[in-house]
Amino acid sequence: MSSIGTGYDLSASTFSPDGRVFQVEYAMKAVENSSTAIGIRCKDGVVFGVEKLVLSKLYEEGSNKRLFNVDRHVGMAVAGLLADARSLADIAREEASNFRSNFGYNIPLKHLADRVAMYVHAYTLYSAVRPFGCSFMLGSYSVNDGAQLYMIDPSGVSYGYWGCAIGKARQAAKTEIEKLQMKEMTCRDVVKEVAKIIYIVHDEVKDKAFELELSWVGEITNGRHEIVPKDVREEAEKYAKESLKEEDESDDDNM
């Protein structure tokens, strides 16, 4: 009975006999059904890429963004329920703002990730609330700490990463990320690879149209989190499409 959650999945405060909290697992399912987001840390910054699915031709271009500014030096990429993610982005902004007001300098990313992770975890403890149905990555760059990247999942666990992927194609994306020499690459190099990975893992059969969202924070932006300029994004998309075309042609030749 416990293996399918019968009777034990009604509340986030209830454990099943085999030690599982089904509401948290269901929240993770919401993330797994979402479009893919990846973050890669390199020697001079962090680059985020998001496959934002376009569910209707009537949507205005650029709406429902999945990349957020949390602070001047911190960016956030999300997968899962967008409304939940926006709520957590506001919480993260409040934490960053309060820290600067109290201490007079930018919040360290490790501290911010831990604070928001504790907030997310609190929503897995009580029957009156439900877990957040999203995972998100936080990235920053500073002269003292260098590039940093953290991921927080619906259970409230926070991990530091060199490369991370969340969403429906996370396994395929992680496989591609592992092929990269991230510690030797710059943000300019990584932007192209991020675009390429998003195009590789995109499922053209199930999900026809998508918008590629790219942002970065690093030396190239003087430590500020910014959306990648249009010309750089278009160059990255062109590189991604050409790489895919070359791979398809080589596969055809091998056959």
Swiss-Prot record:
Record key words, sorted: Acetylation, Cytoplasm, Nucleus, Phosphoprotein, Proteasome
Main location: cytoplasm
Gene3D superfamilies assigned to the protein according to its UniProt record, in alphabetical order: Glutamine Phosphoribosylpyrophosphate, subunit 1, domain 1 (3.60.20.10)
GO cellular component: cytosol; nucleus; proteasome core complex; proteasome core complex, alpha-subunit complex
Residues bearing the modification N-acetylserine: 2
Location of Phosphoserine modifications: 243, 250
Protein localization: Cytoplasm; Nucleus
Transmembrane segments: none
Residues recorded with modification N6-acetyllysine: 57, 206, 230
SMART domains to which the protein is assigned, alphabetical: Proteasome_A_N (SM00948)
Residues forming coiled coils: none
InterPro entries: Ntn_hydrolases_N, Proteasome_alpha, Proteasome_alpha-type, Proteasome_asu_N, Proteasome_sua/b
Pfam families: Proteasome, Proteasome_A_N
Gene Ontology biological process: proteasome-mediated ubiquitin-dependent protein catabolic process
Its biological purpose: Component of the 20S core proteasome complex involved in the proteolytic degradation of most intracellular proteins. This complex plays numerous essential roles within the cell by associating with different regulatory particles. Associated with two 19S regulatory particles, forms the 26S proteasome and thus participates in the ATP-dependent degradation of ubiquitinated proteins.
Subunit structure: The 26S proteasome consists of a 20S proteasome core and two 19S regulatory subunits. The 20S proteasome core is a barrel-shaped complex made of 28 subunits that are arranged in four stacked rings. The two outer rings are each formed by seven alpha subunits, and the two inner rings are formed by seven beta subunits. The proteolytic activity is exerted by three beta-subunits PSMB5, PSMB6 and PSMB7. Interacts with AURKB. Interacts with CDKN1A. Interacts with MDM2 and RB1. Interacts with the C-terminus of TBXA2R isoform 2. Interacts with DNAJB2.
Family: Belongs to the peptidase T1A family.
Entry protein name: Proteasome subunit alpha type-3
Species, as recorded: Bos taurus
Lineage, top ranks: Eukaryota, Metazoa, Chordata, Craniata, Vertebrata
Name of the encoding gene: PSMA3
